[in-house]
Swiss-Prot record:
Ranges of biased composition (kind: Low complexity): 121-140, 232-242, 576-593
The name this protein goes by in its record: Cytoplasmic polyadenylation element-binding protein 3
Pfam families with a match to the protein in the record: CEBP_ZZ (PF16366), RRM_7 (PF16367)
Keyword Iron: no
A cellular component annotation (GO) from this entry: synapse
Compositional bias ranges of the Basic and acidic residues kind: 16-26, 243-256
Keyword Disulfide bond among UniProt keywords: no
RRM domain location: 294-316
Origin species: Caenorhabditis japonica
A molecular function GO annotation: ribosome binding
Region: Disordered, residue numbers: 1-31, 98-185, 220-283, 564-593, 630-657
Alphabetic keyword roster: RNA-binding
Compositional bias per record (Polar residues), positions renumbered to this chain: 259-275
Taxonomy of the source species: Eukaryota, Metazoa, Ecdysozoa, Nematoda, Chromadorea
CDD domains: Bbox1, RRM1_CPEB1, RRM2_CPEB1
Length: 734
């Protein structure tokens, strides 16, 4: 025989197992598996053991012989341990994976039949294994489905995939035809049942589909956000088994327009991070009119007032306004500073943090124009200039560049139509904006608010007596939806290449009536989503008198006219005199009648911003804003012979029976167009702070006064005076 010598024992070992009765005839039946000895390529994991089926059988051959070469010896598969059997089958599977079948071939390789003979339990059922063998197309459930005779031909058409993966995983990469019966495999059957179950319960929804919207009716004027409100009834078209997906869907729920004129707007979950990004447009003016006051930033800490006047004095006579200077006036400190005091000393003296800026005030606006001609400006600048000043050091003179921000008076107002100024703005669509940057003009603020919330009718910026902005203003929207959206946001971050600012947005209550009784002027505003209404003092006490400790609604006390605050004070606090009028007379419920009941201006008062430590609740004036109050010694009370009907048409005149009035030259609110010639300080005031009782020379006790900015000053006992509320005279005794 031409076979190798080492194959004879294996051939002999197979005879007794197959045909022991043919020993006499001399015939030897070779097991079919021993015919796979050539051209077998392993494409799965490369085994360190045999490279062919013959070598594999030779490795597992039992070497014990009886000494006679002609005695057949069993391969001994049934004598192997369970680990050896699993290892043998795994290696056999790896060696035979390269035997592929062509279309139309259904015969199995001998190695596949041998593997199925020894391990029938690796299939789900015997019938499933038989049906798999009869199919004409290969599948992942029939690993040994091709004969090894055509291995070289099948691999000649395509290159082998050299991947260090298991044999079964390599079969998954082949292109397969879908199986007609999904129950052939346990995994496929389970997947099919799960798919059918989901198909019956759910309807497919596009990924970008917006959730359904629900119409809800709520009280008039209320506004609710998804983060603060309880979860509303919401019908979803899909059911998700993942809690994370449910939470994501809840965050995406958007409530719709509600009952009344209040429109619900979608708010980001990160409400405080609402922001606007953009650039300020370049300014181009024709014969502009500048304010006499300019901002000077980047000032050295050790610069003195003399050095500033020396640098800016060449353009005209000027004065220096230090940050926090108005705090010393209101706190009773001396206005006399040490000579040659620098910026750090001024900040320390006024009790405020050290700042790097000052204000320069010129006598003539033409000096500001001359200064700007000597300044440098960036191409396309948005209103900032740069000027070099001389800072005197101990042994040398240093040249420093500071920033100059002037103000054009026409930038304080911007309206689409001039007729709005004649008709007047709508207070219920007006919001207050605070903490504005000095480079934000009315037109810039108009563009920002319109981009973020909606159409804007008019923007007004508040200025001081020098017509320089004080960092606050009012924005009137065209629609109520934009107004409520702005109120709900509360804060807007403005990001530009020049600055970053966090702008405050609050309701503006000037000339607004109570939304509960519709009779009294509104004094506060409740931002709680369950209320979101304007209230007078009485209605607030009724609606919020039983607030629990857990649910406390904090009112937004917006500075309005000081006289309105006194009306609310008289109607709310019972300890005042019974003669104090708390309501307008019959038939006089208009604004004219309301102002006719105003507190007489003979009350000694300081009309202006509150102290830095007790500023307005929402920052209606900055702590570093400077105001120099002016004392008017002449009284402004009307004569006793004047009647109520004459007061609305007369002008206030001085007489000798009143107290002084301290009027701040920096009103927070610009003059309002009133029906009666009320002095401007009444319409512009933001607080009333009265001196002590000894100021009047009267022993009358002081009483708490509920000011509009929640600052508790004092006011003497009022007495009736010809139908008016007037202060006690200087010689008044109880």
């Amino acid at each position: 025989m031409d076979r190798n010598d080492d194959s004879a024992p294996v051939q002999a070992a197979a005879e007794p197992a197959e045909h022991p009765g043919d020993e006499k005839s001399g015939k030897r039946n070779v097991p079919p598996a021993l015919k796979l000895v050539e051209n077998v390529v392993a494409t799965g994991e490369k085994s360190p053991a045999p490279a062919s089926v013959y070598d594999l059988f030779k490795k597992y051959h039992k070497g014990e012989k009886n000494g006679e070469e002609n005695v057949n010896v069993n391969v001994g598969f049934d004598q192997l341990s369970s680990d050896e059997k699993s290892g043998f089958l795994r290696k056999l599977q790896m060696l035979t994976v390269g035997s592929k079948k062509k279309d139309g071939e259904s015969s199995q390789s001998p190695a596949g039949r041998l593997l199925k003979k020894f391990v029938p339990s690796r299939r789900t059922t015997p019938t499933a294994s038989a049906s798999t063998a009869k199919t004409t197309s290969p599948s992942r459930f029939s690993v040994f489905g091709r004969s090894a005779k055509k291995v070289s031909e099948s691999f000649s058409s395509q290159k082998p995939i050299h991947r260090k993966q298991s044999a079964r995983r390599l079969q998954f990469t082949e292109k397969e035809n879908p199986q007609p019966d999904a129950a052939r495999n346990k995994v496929v059957a389970a997947m099919t049942r799960e798919y059918e179950k989901l198909s019956k319960e759910c309807a497919p929804v596009p990924i970008n589909n917006k959730p359904a919207r629900v119409q809800m009716q709520i009280p008039r004027g209320s506004l609710e956000t998804p983060t603060d409100s309880p979860v509303k009834s919401f019908s979803s078209t899909t059911t998700s088994s993942s809690p994370e997906k449910e939470r994501e869907k809840e965050k995406e729920k958007i409530e719709q327009p509600r009952y009344g004129t209040t429109q619900r707007q979608s708010v980001n979950s990160q409400q405080s991070s609402a922001s606007w990004h953009g650039e300020l447009p370049p300014r181009d003016y024709t014969s502009p009119t500048f304010s006499r006051k300019i901002f000077v930033g980047g000032v050295p800490w050790d610069i003195t007032e003399a050095a500033l006047k020396d640098s800016f004095g060449e353009f005209g006579s000027c004065a220096v306004e230090w940050p926090g200077q108005e705090a010393r006036y209101r706190s009773g400190q001396s206005n006399v500073m040490p000579p040659n005091a620098n910026l750090r000393a001024h900040s320390k003296y006024s009790g405020q943090a050290t700042t790097g800026y000052v204000y320069m005030i010129f006598e003539d606006e033409r000096a500001v124009a001359a200064l700007l001609h000597e300044c440098s400006q960036e191409i396309g600048g948005a209103g900032e200039w740069y000027f070099k000043i001389r800072a005197q050091r101990s042994k040398s003179t240093e040249i420093r560049q500071v920033q100059i921000i002037p103000w054009v008076t026409s930038d304080s107002l911007y309206c689409h139509e001039e007729s709005i100024l004649e008709v007047g703005i709508e207070p219920k669509r007006t919001v207050f904006v605070g903490a504005l940057h000095g480079m934000m003009t009315a037109q810039v603020l108009h563009s920002i608010m319109e981009d973020c919330f909606g159409c804007v009718e008019c923007v007004q910026l508040d200025t001081d007596k020098f017509k320089y902005p004080i960092g606050s203003g009012r924005v009137t929207f065209r629609e109520h939806g934009a107004y409520f959206k702005a109120i709900e946001i509360g804060y807007l971050h403005v990001h530009t290449s020049k600055f970053r600012k966090r702008v405050q947005i609050d309701p503006f209550l000037e000339s607004t009536s109570c939304m509960v009784c519709n009779l009294e002027p509104a004094h506060c505003f409740c931002r709680n989503r369950n209320c979101f209404k304007y209230y007078c003092h009485s209605c607030w006490s009724i609606d919020h008198g039983k607030d629990t400790v857990v649910d406390v609604h904090v009112p937004v006390i917006v500075p309005s006219s000081a006289t309105k605050a006194y009306q609310g004070h008289a109607s709310r606090h019972s300890h005042l005199s019974s003669n104090s009028p708390s309501k307008a007379r019959d038939g006089q419920n208009s604004n004219n009648s309301q102002f006719s009941q105003l507190l007489s201006p003979a009350f000694p008062m300081i009309v202006g911003a509150p102290t830095p430590t007790l500023s307005a609740l929402y920052g209606y004036i900055q702590n570093n804003h400077t105001m120099s109050p002016t004392v008017y010694d002449g009284p402004l009370t009307p004569p006793s012979s004047e009647t109520m009907s004459k007061r609305g048409s007369r002008e206030f005149s001085s007489n000798s029976n009143g107290g002084p009035v301290f009027i701040s030259p920096a009103p927070v609110l610009s003059s309002q167009k009133l029906e009666t010639p009320i002095p401007s300080y009444f319409a512009n005031s933001t607080a009333i702070l009265t001196p002590t009782s000894t100021y009047y020379g009267s022993p009358s006790t002081q009483q708490t006064y509920y000011a509009p900015n929640v600052y508790y000053g004092y006011m003497p006992q009022p007495i009736p005076y010809d139908g008016y509320v007037c202060p006690p005279p200087a010689n008044y005794t109880q």
